[in-house]
Amino acid sequence: MSIKSDRWIRRMAEQHGMIEPFEPGQVRHAGEERIVSYGTSSYGYDVRCADEFKIFTNINSSIVDPKAFDARSFVDVKSDVCIIPPNSFALARTVEYFRIPRSVLTICLGKSTYARCGIIVNVTPLEPEWEGHVTLEFSNTTPLPAKIYANEGVAQMLFLESDEVCETSYKDRGGKYQGQVGVTLPKT
């Protein structure tokens, strides 16, 4: 497997719709204000967080069960910022919609700006031929409330191309998160 460059990312986004909307360069300012950067980097793509958040609360549940997850465990927030309670987490989604090629596996890593503040971003790999908005999980590992900014960079996608096309893609096996839009809760 080889990691793909900015040239490849740009070509795949512009000619094949791999990332929509797509930013061909790095954006570091909104007007006069400095922001957490997003867009194409040397060997990756920095994604933005949309303004839709689901903030975890334990008001309605006594246990978290991925097989029987209670949607009431979240409070929905639509805002330019999300305040995550201490030692809690929130879900969000990318602004960008992805269409992953059949020969590519995409890995998501959190941006150091957030990691250095104790805010961890977790996303599972984007498998070959998966498409949709990426659901992002932000963990606040600190004893203080933590802030996430919508429409700014939150994580970096790395694209790895295999030497051989997979026999069965995510689309082929009818993956449960195929085509997801918005923030998507756990499914079994």
UniProtKB/Swiss-Prot annotation:
<feature type="active site" description="Proton donor/acceptor">
    <location>
        <position position="137"/>
    </location>
</feature>
<comment type="function">
    <text>Catalyzes the deamination of dCTP to dUTP.</text>
</comment>
<dbReference type="GO" id="GO:0006226">
    <property type="term" value="P:dUMP biosynthetic process"/>
</dbReference>
<dbReference type="Pfam" id="PF22769">
    <property type="entry name" value="DCD"/>
</dbReference>
<protein>
    <recommendedName>
        <fullName>dCTP deaminase</fullName>
        <ecNumber>3.5.4.13</ecNumber>
    </recommendedName>
</protein>
<feature type="binding site">
    <location>
        <begin position="135"/>
        <end position="137"/>
    </location>
    <ligand>
        <name>dCTP</name>
    </ligand>
</feature>
<keyword id="KW-0547">Nucleotide-binding</keyword>
<dbReference type="InterPro" id="IPR033704">
    <property type="entry name" value="dUTPase_trimeric"/>
</dbReference>
<comment type="subunit">
    <text>Homotrimer.</text>
</comment>
<dbReference type="InterPro" id="IPR036157">
    <property type="entry name" value="dUTPase-like_sf"/>
</dbReference>
<feature type="binding site">
    <location>
        <begin position="111"/>
        <end position="116"/>
    </location>
    <ligand>
        <name>dCTP</name>
    </ligand>
</feature>
<feature type="binding site">
    <location>
        <position position="170"/>
    </location>
    <ligand>
        <name>dCTP</name>
    </ligand>
</feature>
<keyword id="KW-0378">Hydrolase</keyword>
<dbReference type="InterPro" id="IPR011962">
    <property type="entry name" value="dCTP_deaminase"/>
</dbReference>
<comment type="similarity">
    <text>Belongs to the dCTP deaminase family.</text>
</comment>
<dbReference type="GO" id="GO:0015949">
    <property type="term" value="P:nucleobase-containing small molecule interconversion"/>
</dbReference>
<dbReference type="GO" id="GO:0000166">
    <property type="term" value="F:nucleotide binding"/>
</dbReference>
<keyword id="KW-0546">Nucleotide metabolism</keyword>
<dbReference type="GO" id="GO:0008829">
    <property type="term" value="F:dCTP deaminase activity"/>
</dbReference>
<feature type="binding site">
    <location>
        <position position="180"/>
    </location>
    <ligand>
        <name>dCTP</name>
    </ligand>
</feature>
<dbReference type="GO" id="GO:0006229">
    <property type="term" value="P:dUTP biosynthetic process"/>
</dbReference>
<comment type="pathway">
    <text>Pyrimidine metabolism; dUMP biosynthesis; dUMP from dCTP (dUTP route): step 1/2.</text>
</comment>
<feature type="binding site">
    <location>
        <position position="156"/>
    </location>
    <ligand>
        <name>dCTP</name>
    </ligand>
</feature>
